[in-house]
Every structure is written in structure tokens, then in C-alpha cells.
Amino acid sequence: MESPTHPKPSKDKTFPWNLVFLVGILFQIDMGMANPSPHQVYNVTWVITNVQTNSRANATSMLGTLTDAYPTLYVDLCDLVGDTWEPIAPDPRSWARYSSSTHGCKTTDRKKQQQTYPFYVCPGHAPSMGPKGTYCGGAQDGFCAAWGCETTGEAWWKPTSSWDYITVKRGSNQDNSCKGKCNPLVLQFTQKGRQASWDRPKMWGLRLYRSGYDPIALFSVSRQVMTITPPQAMGPNLVLPDQKPPSRQSQTKSKVTTQRPQITSSTPRSVASATMGPKRIGTGDRLINLVQGTYLALNATDPNKTKDCWLCLVSRPPYYEGIAVLGNYSNQTNPPPSCLSTPQHKLTISEVSGQGLCIGTVPKTHQALCKKTQKGHKGTHYLAAPNGTYWACNTGLTPCISMAVLNWTSDFCVLIELWPRVTYHQPEYIYTHFDKAVRFRREPISLTVALMLGGLTVGGIAAGVGTGTKALLETAQFRQLQIAMHTDIQALEESISALEKSLTSLSEVVLQNRRGLDILFLQEGGLCAALKEECCFYADHTGLVRDNMAKLRERLKQRQQLFDSQQGWFEGWFNKSPWFTTLISSIMGPLLILLLILLLGPCILNRLVQFVKDRISVVQALILTQQYQQIQQYDSDRP
């Protein structure tokens, strides 16, 4: 490629490449965000079109994923041909090729005549793949310029191939009089066709096998993919107005529900109002509902744990965690309603614990999550998870999985319960944060509610529905928590969609504006040359945010140093780590005992040795007195 002439130095030409690189990054981000879940169900329509007349010969629609939505297509040969085989009298060449007595579908006799001729089909999406490098021609030859280019059809030599996308055969005819459609064709997709990309139409050529010139008909097969409920954007961006604090009504409701709920008719109405309320709630209300629903579920299962506790919603990822469970899923041939509500984007669950039901080929790294493993089912089946559960696959979170996708991608899924990441704390843990001298007696214990309520859907409440008032109560409280989680996930999906559209619109506007300005100032050498700018770039203001964060960290560091300077040397030890406090309290007793032994041990030992020696001397004296007798002494002076 030749470089365009430019009057400015070479450094002025660097910005367009930087812009292309920047926009390329934007498109990569957009493509990553727009990558849907492979289990997403769409309304897929297959259209067969006569290329020569641009008329639609057949259109078949079905619900399914992009992997298994390959139905059998039925089309009539006369609809596929149209008027292209009708005789053209003024042209002698055409008259010789298309005899008015044998071709076309205008009369009943001609329709019956088409049933007697074999036909063969040649692909136009790969015209060079003939036998031994034979060129198969173009559209004027029906892509069948040489024998061996045909890949399917209904002829005596039975044309086949291992790489073409479709097979075309004759169907059964029910109309012997040929007053209607009497030349049915059956089009089926091959395994290669199911693996191919159908982003654009693909063309084939169909020719009748007869003596002389074989008539040609060109047709194309295309796929149209539409979502079940197409999104409609109206008004401003919904992401920014959604960031609002909790409403007072939600706070008042939370105070009322802190007591033990009773079995009344108001409980179902509160659940129904939460699902059918037309008012759009904000981020603050959604977070409050998650904590409130968690409390109600925990209070319904174990009221003793909710007498004095703290429930904290974790503000850092992961926001949800999964508990693997065992359950009975529903196996259906048509997509159930739960499959139609599959998220548009892939949601990843980074933390899954426990053991449950696994479907597919599970690698060794994840076999610890499987208590029961099933290989799945062959064919087109949809496995819907039980109410309140999801399938956690390595391609994302989904309430319904397609076995065609699972078998084709070698994917695996685990049946899980989805819980918000809410930690359970004893009251002492919170009180220490309000104490000026923070001292932890031991390492604080924090449990997630998922570990405390795991298996509630399948093994606990769901199994006890209808057995009494407690089961009904716990089911209602758990359902309210599920509604809160569903609302939060739905809001997350809407936010991602809105951000995706904003990014796409921004990249399109940047490209259009820059391309238009460069074309407008083409004679001057481009926009930068016309503005006489040596450097054209986008001013990124994230540096200001980075500087402000650095200043904030510096102020926090100064406050920490001031706080440490006001403390004594002994108090500073216990504020460094709770592990240090636990270690000191554990070894202080043995250390004091050892110190006392070292100080008082020698004195006590000396006294003990002296006492033993004295007793030994006494014993020796007693032994000597027993073996000898005392000699009596007489005084000579005494009479």
C-alpha cells in the first residue's frame, strides 16, 4: 500500500494509527461484553430464497439455541424455481434450452413432468472444491460446470459429499392431481452445516438431469436470529438514575419485618407486590431487600440465631456464591418458559462449594463438586433447573441448558443454589469496631449465610411444602429472598446492557466524526494538519482521579501515624493483628510458670536436698545404736 503524501513531518501522521488502535480496543471490549451465553434461546428463522427472482420460497421459524436450531426445511420445487424455467420465445437460444413442453410450473402437465426428472445440487459457497481441483464454475453454470461438483440431489448415481452444509431430497407427494404443490423437496442440515457460520446467506445451484442442456435454478439459505423480547431503549441512560439511596418506605418496612413473621394472608400479597410492582427500585432498595430477605429466610429456619446478630452484605466481588445441591430437573424437547429468560450476558459464579448434581464431562479439577454425575441426553433436549436453582456451567450461569450445546462444546454444569454473599457475625464483632482501643480476644468468626442455609431449596423447604404452617412460612420467606436476588441480577443485566450500548454508540460516533473530519480536510492533509496541531490525542482525565486517590492515601497514612503516636508501646502490640493477641494470651501462662520455676527452683531444690541429708543422718544414727551396746562407766571415787 502506498503512503499518502503529507506536507507535515512524520510525527503528525501517527495519530490516525493510534485512533485505529484505540477504536480496536473499544471494539474488542464491546465484542467481549456482547458475547451471549451459548444456552440463550432465540427465535431462529431459516429462509430459502430464489436468487434469480429474489422471492422467498420458504421460511421456517423455531425456538432454540444457535447450536440446535437446525430444523428440517420443506420447500416446493416450483416455489424454488418460479418463472425462471418458463419459455422465452423471442430468443432462439433460450428456446432451444428451455422447451415449452417440458419445463416450467405454469401448467399442471409441466408440474407433473418435473417429477420424472432427476436433479442434482452444487454448492456456491465453495465453488473451487471440485474433484482434483476442477473448477465448478459460477452462477451462470449453477456451480456445476464439471461432473463431480454436485454434492447432493436425487439422481441415479446418488451424489453425496462429506463437507457440504445441506442435503436436498425429494419428499412424499400427497397431491396426485398437481393442482397445488406436487414437487416437495426436503432440505436437511449436515454436521458440517451445524458447525458452519451462518452470518451471511449461502448459495446453491439446482439443475435438472435431462438430455441436452440442464436447466438451472439458484437458491440461497439464510438464518435470521431474533431475541424473544427485543430490547427497546427509551429515554435517558437508566444506569445513572438507578444509583440512589434507599427509600424511607423500604426502611420502615424493614423495621416491621424484624419480628417473627406470622402466617397470614398478607404474606402472599407482599410477595406478589414485590414481583408485580411497576415502580423501578434503585440500587439502595435492592441492597436492603437482599439483606432483609436473607434475614427472613434465616429467621424462618433458625430463630435462635437471629435474636442478636449482624448481617453484612459484602461490598466486594464476588457478590454471590453457589452451593451445589442434588435435585430433579425437568427434561423437555421444547424450550420451557425458564429457557426464554436466560440472561443475555454470561454471569460467572467464582465461588461454588458443596457437592451436588453434575451434567456433562466434568474435568478432574471440578470433580470435587459432584456427588452425582450424569452424562446427559442425546438429541435436542432442554434441562430446566428446579425453582430457586440454577445451572452453573463453565460458560456462565443459566436456569436452563441445551443438551445440543452441552454435547457440542464439551461443557459441564453443576446444579446450584444462588445466595447473596451476606456474612453472619456475632454482636461482639461489631462492638469492637466502636471501641476506641480495638483489641480482639480471638480471631473473629464470620460465616456466610449460604453455608448456614445451603440446601434450603431442594433438601429443606421445598421437600416440606404442604406438611404444615412452618413449611409454608419458610417457603414464603425463601421466595422473598429469591425475588430480591432475581431483581438484583436483572438490574445488573440491564446495567451491563446499557453500558454496552453506550460504549457502542460512543465508538460509532468517534469513528463517524473523525472519518468525516478527515475527509473534509483531506486536501489539507487531515484534521490534525488543518488545525496545525503537532499531536492530536484524547485527553484522559483518569490522571486527576489517580492523583486525588494518592492524596487521600497520604492523608490516611498521616492520620494512622498520629493515632499510633498517641498510643503506648504496650497498646500498640495488640492493635497490629488479632493473631498476635491470641498468641500472647495463649503462651503467657506457660511463660510465667517457666519463669517462676527458674527463679524459685534452685532455692526449693537446695532446701529439699538439705532436708533429705538430715533425715539420712538420723537414720544412720539409729542403725548404729541398734548394733552396739553402750558401756557403763564407773566412778572410782564413789563407794
Swiss-Prot record:
Positions of glycan attachment: N43, N58, N299, N304, N328, N331, N387, N407
The protein's superkingdom reads Viruses
Name of one Pfam family that matches: TLV_coat
- Where is there biased composition of kind Polar residues? 246-273
Q: Which InterPro entries match?
A: FMuLV_rcpt-bd, TLV/ENV_coat_polyprotein
What are the start and end residues of every segment in region (Fusion peptide)? 445-465
Q: Where is this motif: CXXC?
A: 309-312
Assembly notes: The mature envelope protein (Env) consists of a trimer of SU-TM heterodimers attached by a labile interchain disulfide bond.
UniProt-recorded name of the protein: Envelope glycoprotein
- Gene that this polypeptide is encoded by: env
